[in-house]
Swiss-Prot record:
Its EC number is 3.1.1.4. It is found in: Secreted; Nematocyst. It comes from Urticina crassicornis. This is Phospholipase A2 A2-actitoxin-Ucs2a. GO terms for cellular component: extracellular region; nematocyst. The active site is at H90, D137. Its main location: secreted. InterPro entries: PLipase_A2, PLipase_A2_Asp_AS, PLipase_A2_dom, PLipase_A2_dom_sf, PLipase_A2_His_AS. Residues 1-19 form the signal peptide. PROSITE patterns: PA2_ASP (PS00119), PA2_HIS (PS00118). The keyword Nucleotide-binding does not apply. Binds 1 Ca(2+) ion.
Amino acid sequence: MKNNIILVILLGISVFVDCLPLNDQEEDKSLNAQESEVSAVQKRDILQFSGMIRCATGRSAWKYFNYGNWCGWGGSGTAVDGVDSCCRSHDWCYKRHDSCYPKIIPYIASTSGSHPSCSITCHSANNRCQRDVCNCDKVAAECFARNTYHPNNKH
């Protein structure tokens, strides 16, 4: 229950943060013609994952909370579909990188375009842990985009 409350708070913050304007330095970068297609360059922790999901799928991260047997905090049993398998793989990826504190480590990533032409990049300035966690999130978001979302699997 405590973990679910924390996730709800984090997802709520992510919705708020995704609505905030970029800071002045990032706004200046967005004016550069070479970077005009980049919709966001942000340094965040688990909240960054929600931006990747939005870009890759066109859906809010909320749609994936309590979906199937694996989406949300924890998970067990058999994956109910491809989306749920993405969540299971994401959980296992975080587990492989547990020493990096994947739920809280900040990393730098950028998204450009939007669903269905989203591009997600994990920045080269990330250290090993940041790169690994960023890639866990990127792979999961792209996996969500490749699989059919079934609303009846959300509970």
